[in-house]
């Protein structure tokens, strides 16, 4: 179930301030954030935002097709290394 349209999209204030400050600065730096719940706005396009995945900050370059999605969607928290190999030959 999605968010109500009357509420509008959510973005943390501290993240929005960092993006606006970056817009005024001539050099682009990576913006670190722990806010996986924030929605990607059109003003974020072209910036690299490092999203925390519980262990490290994953750099995410914001592109046009990412607008409307959440930052956490692009920084997976779980690492899947596959199921154990089938060892039927070694059991005989």
Curated annotation (Swiss-Prot):
InterPro entries: Ribosomal_uS19 (IPR002222), Ribosomal_uS19_bac-type (IPR005732), Ribosomal_uS19_CS (IPR020934), Ribosomal_uS19_SF (IPR023575). Keywords: Ribonucleoprotein, Ribosomal protein, RNA-binding, rRNA-binding. The keyword Protein biosynthesis does not apply. GO terms for cellular component: cytoplasm; small ribosomal subunit. It comes from the Bacteria. GO terms for biological process: ribosomal small subunit assembly; translation. Transmembrane segments: none annotated. Pfam families: Ribosomal_S19 (PF00203). The keyword rRNA-binding applies. GO terms for molecular function: rRNA binding; structural constituent of ribosome. Belongs to the universal ribosomal protein uS19 family. Protein S19 forms a complex with S13 that binds strongly to the 16S ribosomal RNA. This is Small ribosomal subunit protein uS19. It comes from Streptococcus uberis (strain ATCC BAA-854 / 0140J). The gene is rpsS.
